[in-house]
């Protein structure tokens, strides 16, 4: 569902009839830019590879991956809402100690699991408009209150203070 929802979060490029036409007001565009600037900075701060053998650390490129990062976040939120709605107010019994919401987020994380060499990490970071799988998960989830609620998280490595979070859609 997160992948399908991701494709639904393309923003201002198309009008209600599906024609390529930017339909936003200047105020809409300014508000959107303010939020996306925060998301870019969050991703720019991610060290994807530490410094090694005299080479500097490689950082994620939040500007390059912005469109896909927005789509991942929006798609995950839409998918989680659809998932909750499908339960019709019931709460399934935990499975293997995990609640339904926890399993939802674990399934999302599993979707993007990767085992790739450092050289490929460096290459993809420079040219792929998608963030690496680890960050499609961790950096996206850190902004979503429903994720924190699912795991009763109030601190720790994954925790981001509420005032630093940004939700685009």
Q: Which residues are covered by each model-predicted region?
A:
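Single conserved hydrophobic/aromatic residue that forms the stacking wall/gate
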Residues: 1-5, 9-10
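Zinc-dependent metallohydrolase catalytic domains
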Residues: 11-169
